[in-house]
């Protein structure tokens, strides 16, 4: 139900229901009759909790929610051992490529842990020549890159209604951003 107030220059009187008392003449008494008003059903009488809609940029699918929940649990447990990057390749592939490049002949390598077999054929040349690249010095993060991911994941979880309350998610996000900036902020 929505109530709209319209402000005008003239005064509007409210509607009045007379249930008893004197009439305009003041001599006669109004009959004491009870006016029966139909009762509202019990469900309508109960005061509903006010619902505030929270706009979301994009809602996550059930699979995305499950993945984020799983990720959050693993972060809480500290289970980082089984993590692999999205572009993960078997060690057999890199070993076969390295052997083929250095020998100049086709090479095969097998990963005994997973059973992955990789074959590599050199494109051109005899191999053996390798250029040394000067490594650019990168600033190392305290505790590796995983602590840096925690606020991002927490923000993602906080942004999805159903996993965490939105207000709680926002409060946690602000605190985590503050801690993150305190540790990794611009230091010169």
Curated annotation (Swiss-Prot):
Transmembrane segments: none annotated. Residues 1-128, 145-188 form a propeptide. InterPro entries: Adenovirus_late_L2_mu_core (IPR008393). Residues 24-49 have a biased composition (Basic residues). GO terms for molecular function: DNA binding. The keyword Mitochondrion does not apply. Its main location: virion. The keyword DNA-binding applies. Keywords: DNA-binding, Late protein, Virion. It holds the Pfam family Adeno_PX. The record marks 14-15, 144-145 as: Cleavage. Coiled coil: none annotated. It is found in: Virion. GO terms for cellular component: viral nucleocapsid. Residues 22-52 are annotated as: Disordered. The role of the precursor might be to condense the viral prochromatin for encapsidation by virtue of the two basic domains. Belongs to the adenoviridae pX family. This is Late L2 mu core protein. The gene is PX.
């Amino acid at each position: 139900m929505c109530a709209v107030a319209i402000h005008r220059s003239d005064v509007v009187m409210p509607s009045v229901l007379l249930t008893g008392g004197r009439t305009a003449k003041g001599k006669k008494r109004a009959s004491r009759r009870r006016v029966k008003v139909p009762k509202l059903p019990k469900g309508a009488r109960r005061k509903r909790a006010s619902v505030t809609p929270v706009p979301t940029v994009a809602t996550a699918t059930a699979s995305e929610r499950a993945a984020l929940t799983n990720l959050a649990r693993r972060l809480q447990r500290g289970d980082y051992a089984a993590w692999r990057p999205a572009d993960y390749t078997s060690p057999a592939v890199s070993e076969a490529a390295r052997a083929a490049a250095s020998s100049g002949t086709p090479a095969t390598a097998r990963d005994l842990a997973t059973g992955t077999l990789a074959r590599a054929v050199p494109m051109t040349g005899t191999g053996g020549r390798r250029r040394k690249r000067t490594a650019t010095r990168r600033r190392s993060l305290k505790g590796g890159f995983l602590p840096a991911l925690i606020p991002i994941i927490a923000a993602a979880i906080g942004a999805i209604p159903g996993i965490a309350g939105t207000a709680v998610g926002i409060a946690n996000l602000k605190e985590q951003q503050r801690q993150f900036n305190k540790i990794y902020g611009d230091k010169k």
